[in-house]
């Protein structure tokens, strides 16, 4: 629901694995009428590429399932930066050693289909295949990369669900703001 509130996103697809452990995700998507693409559990880059290809996406916006409190305005901010031009990839954070200024759990990455296709064709490292877009930003000069920083710096805030404790906090937040 939160991603679909973006002013820029015209289509939403959940890209999950073809592992039977993720059948509940497929059931949830079917129940909600949300398109679902299933692909490799380990070659996530291939899953994203095949999904984007099947759905004929020109621009790919990647947010992850461990970010259920993602802010649609943050998604739009990164998309707008990408659409301004001058880059093949835009994100509001990169892995360390890069400094994070957006809260953990608001992670948004945007790239063109052409850049995703090049990554899919050329990424050969396991890490690049598993984490989808490192091929686009790991080698300076290979692609035009734009980092969308947050001011003031909110990089220490945490709105993700990676642990049981995170889940309990998320449930409490959702309960407090149920309406």
Feature names for model-found ranges:
Residues 175-179:
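Left-handed beta-helix
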Residues 1-3, 29, 136-137:
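Hydrophobic C-terminal alpha-helix "anchor/cap" residues
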Residues 10, 58, 88:
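Conserved acidic residues
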Residues 1-21:
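N-terminal glycine-rich phosphate-binding loop and ensuing alpha1 helix
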Residues 18-85:
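Short phosphate-binding loop-to-helix
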Residues 163:
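Short, conserved phosphate/pyrophosphate- and ester-handling motifs at nucleotide-, phospho-/glycolipid
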């Amino acid at each position: 629901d939160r991603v679909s509130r973006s002013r820029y996103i015209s289509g939403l697809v959940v890209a999950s694995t073809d592992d039977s452990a993720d059948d509940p995700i497929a059931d949830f998507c079917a129940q909600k009428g949300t398109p679902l693409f299933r692909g490799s559990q380990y070659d996530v880059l291939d899953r994203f590429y095949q999904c984007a290809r099947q759905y004929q996406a020109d621009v790919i916006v990647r947010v992850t399932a461990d970010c259920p409190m993602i802010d649609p305005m943050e998604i739009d901010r990164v998309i707008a930066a990408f659409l301004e031009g001058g880059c093949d990839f835009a994100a509001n954070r990169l892995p360390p050693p890069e400094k994070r200024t957006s809260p953990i759990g608001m992670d948004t990455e945007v790239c063109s289909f052409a850049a995703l296709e090049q990554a899919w064709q050329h990424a050969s490292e396991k890490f690049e295949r598993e984490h989808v877009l490192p091929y686009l930003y790991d080698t300076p000069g290979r692609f035009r990369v734009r980092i969308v920083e947050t001011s003031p710096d909110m990089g220490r805030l945490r709105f993700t669900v990676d642990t049981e404790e995170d889940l309990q906090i998320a449930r409490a937040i959702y309960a407090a703001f149920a309406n």
